[in-house]
């Protein structure tokens, strides 16, 4: 069974539109990257451009590293960082809810009202959501 899973992973391909959705950019951007040779593509029997799963994975890692170039490194053990913009802050008497739009991802964090006030968090501010969890569930799409 393990060999079948590995074989399937090797055979996984994505259309330009699927790759764009996964990378959080427009299909035109992915086409330009492909035309410039930044992402290898092949064509299926109908002429549709396809991107290999391993090529897309490698490019997404390189793209993330490129986006973080020149930024100060945070001294933290949380490695899953999502830079974005604060889109909502809901304050309660004790707790608060902060929403961040990080590319195509909407992240919601519950924290204390005191922490929100100390950090001066407000709608429109740039922020980084850092995620550290003992359990992360991954489902196949």
Each predicted region: which residue ranges?
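Polyanion-binding surface elements
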Residues: 7-25
């Amino acid at each position: 069974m393990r060999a079948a899973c590995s074989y399937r992973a090797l055979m996984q391909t994505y259309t330009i539109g699927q790759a764009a959705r996964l990378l959080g950019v427009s299909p035109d951007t992915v086409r330009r990257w492909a035309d410039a040779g930044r992402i290898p593509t092949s064509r299926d029997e109908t002429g549709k451009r396809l991107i290999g799963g391993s090529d897309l994975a490698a490019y997404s890692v390189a793209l993330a590293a490129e986006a973080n170039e020149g930024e100060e490194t945070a001294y933290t053990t949380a490695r899953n960082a999502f830079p974005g913009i604060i889109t909502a802050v809901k304050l309660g008497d004790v707790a608060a809810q902060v929403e961040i739009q990080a590319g195509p991802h909407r992240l919601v964090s519950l924290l204390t009202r005191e922490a929100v006030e100390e950090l001066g968090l407000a709608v429109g501010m740039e922020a980084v959501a850092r995620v550290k969890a003992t359990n992360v569930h991954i489902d196949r799409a």
